């Protein structure tokens, strides 16, 4: 919900605000997850299943940007219920872009497989979903002959480390020339050499300690692969799903590694996800119930991604559209308004806020307001997950 004050007119203009939001919302930046994994771990099966399931789960149009990129909707019953409440013309969920990172295999940094082709796809993702094989199957040969997910993790991590070292060495060469008469460049070279030594020791960039804020700024320029958040997708056999693979030693090893690494982990069966992708919503619910599951792998991955990246959603609602908007936890009202349109942030006045559950319970914003459940919040208000917001702005 967005309200604008027409310039010099002193009145609320719903039409203009909604038209602006409708016009600009498709350009909203999507969260982007890159899916990596060695051959025969289930990576491509999982990618194909998730993108197809995400396309069927909601009315957001599935988009295949190229054979390795798919956009899926984030399941969110809150906007569906708001859509029913407002008899809205359009329900728009938040979306995630999945990228199937091809060619990231052992020796890729030295030209094996597709060589460094994977770099162009993985560099801009927000987080990496690393599919690791945690199932035994004699009919599916592992590239290294046996199942060892920690070895597989190390193999992929080393390729990312080598790619980062190459980027940093080029940066060092460039900045060394400037360092003769530039103190900031000299400081950057010193930091980069320490960072390269850190990586050469087999450590990820995310564990590198920076001395001060200036180093943090210089570090961020490089957009390093080994600094990206990682979610491990433990691909298991169907029998391991019911108890979340509690007795699977491979999964336990991954969980322990992820805990030390500060990464996320979730259990999934790519083969089951492939079957789920072919079902409609009712069939999917019955299928999951038969398996003793409450949610699909796509839903588990989305939750793990939101948790790891510190994300949440606020909602806007009206007769024309009900929509979920993804923001970082801790985002203040003006910046949340800016997700819809920069004018909303620039001309922010107030945010009329009601909790999603309260709005549903009382049936309208007016009724919730009468109960004292609607707050008029200023620029310092920190938006909460599930807030339904009516922005007031003046431009």
Language model segments and positions:
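Short capping/connector residues at structural and topological boundaries
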Residues: 36, 62, 67-70, 77-79, ...
């Amino acid at each position: 919900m967005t309200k604008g004050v027409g310039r010099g007119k002193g009145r609320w203009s719903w039409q203009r605000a909604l038209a602006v939001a409708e016009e600009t919302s498709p350009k909203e930046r999507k969260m982007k997850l890159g899916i990596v994994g060695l051959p025969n771990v289930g990576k491509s099966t999982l990618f194909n299943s998730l993108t197809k399931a995400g396309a069927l789960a909601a009315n957001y149009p599935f988009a295949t940007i190229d054979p390795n990129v798919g956009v899926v909707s984030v399941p969110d019953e809150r906007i569906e219920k708001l859509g029913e409440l407002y008899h809205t013309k359009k329900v728009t969920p938040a979306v995630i872009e999945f990228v199937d990172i091809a060619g990231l295999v052992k020796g890729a940094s030295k030209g094996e497989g597709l060589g460094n082709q994977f770099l162009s796809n993985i560099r801009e993702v927000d987080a990496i979903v690393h599919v690791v094989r945690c199932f035994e199957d004699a009919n599916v040969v592992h590239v290294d002959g046996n199942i060892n997910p920690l070895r597989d993790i190390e193999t992929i991590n080393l390729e990312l480390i080598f790619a980062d070292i190459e980027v940093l060495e080029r940066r060092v060469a460039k900045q060394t020339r400037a360092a003769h008469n530039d103190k900031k460049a000299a400081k950057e070279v010193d930091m980069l050499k320490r960072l390269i030594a850190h990586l050469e020791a087999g450590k990820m960039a995310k564990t590198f300690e920076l001395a001060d804020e200036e180093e943090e700024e210089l570090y961020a320029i490089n957009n390093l692969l080994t600094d990206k958040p990682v979610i491990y997708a433990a691909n298991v056999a169907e029998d391991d799903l019911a108890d979340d693979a509690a007795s699977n030693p491979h999964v336990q090893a991954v969980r322990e590694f992820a805990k030390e690494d500060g990464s996320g982990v979730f259990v999934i069966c790519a083969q089951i996800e492939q079957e789920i992708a072919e079902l409609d919503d009712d069939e999917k619910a019955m299928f999951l119930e038969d398996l003793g599951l409450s949610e699909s792998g796509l839903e588990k991955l989305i939750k793990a991604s939101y948790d790891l990246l510190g994300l949440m959603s606020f909602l806007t609602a009206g007769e024309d559209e009900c929509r979920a908007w993804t923001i970082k936890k801790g985002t203040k009202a003006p910046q949340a308004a800016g997700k819809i349109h920069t004018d909303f942030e620039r001309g922010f006045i107030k945010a009329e806020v009601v909790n999603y559950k309260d709005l549903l319970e009382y049936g309208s914003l007016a009724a919730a307001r009468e109960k004292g459940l609607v707050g008029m919040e200023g620029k310092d208000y920190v938006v909460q997950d599930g807030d339904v917001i009516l922005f007031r702005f003046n431009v």
